[in-house]
Amino acid sequence: MKKESKGTKYKQRTISVWNEVAPFYHKRWAKNEVGPFGVTKKLLELSKIKKSDTVLDLACGTGLVTKKLIRKVGSKGQIYAIDSSESALKIAKKWTGDAKNLHFIRADAEKVQFETKFDAITCQYALFFFPNEQKVLKNMKKLLKKDGTITLAVHGKYNVPYFDCILESVKKFIPDYLPKYPEMDRFGTKETFADAIKKAGFKKIVVKKFVFKYSPGTFSDYWNNYKKHLSKPLKEKFDSLTKFQKVNLREMIKDKTLEYTKKNGKIVFPWEVLVLTAKN
């Protein structure tokens, strides 16, 4: 029997997690474009997608970018939206409506093929999930028309305390809390982001930085919501901590949030996002 590769196992685990968390992700984040999801408008502006364009929304998730593309390309354009999570696609199909020029497909971004060529490809908050991003990027190149455009968004590496306050603390108690492969922040600077795209053969690469604000409420809101919506693999690791460890962890995280806590007790985090455009 052929042994599964590290990348294959990671992809299977990621699909399983997204099938579990997609409903919460959509309700809490994507649906209302809160915090970093304010970047969707910027991404579409920078993409310069026009009426009648044929566009691929790669790793479309629950359909935030996809839904806005319907108006962007108009009735004469075509939109193809792919994702590997059945749960996310189910939400996207229901939320975006039944436009005749919109096509949802469950597919692997590394391998998906189309008879048509695309004027543009969008990919918001997904590139870092791919264990072999070069396979995905090179497949994008094959799918694009000559001089077609890609527009990608990723979280910044250094100014996203929403994640760091919790994760850096948790890893002190559970060193293997998150998988080391792939590194989720590996495109989090302008240089590393541009280098990865250049390596895949794209040209005219431009990276812009945006900083949004997000409030998870009070510290109790932030902490309790995090615990409530952990995926099954992370919950199992978290639950392995003793009561004493959990108390210490909570205090450690609370200390990290103090610089972002306002007088009314609400936390307001900055959230850095990078948006890249490039030509085929």
Give the label of every model feature segment.
Residues K2-K50, L64-K68, A88-I91, W95, ...:
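Conserved class I S-adenosyl-L-methionine
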Residues S52, S75-K76, L144-T149:
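Short glycine-dipeptide loop
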Residues T54-V112, K135:
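Class I SAM-dependent methyltransferase SAM/SAH-binding core
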Residues L69, M140, A278:
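Class I S-adenosylmethionine-dependent transferase superfamily signal
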Residues Q134-K135, T149-G217, K263:
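Conserved catalytic/acceptor-binding region of the Class I
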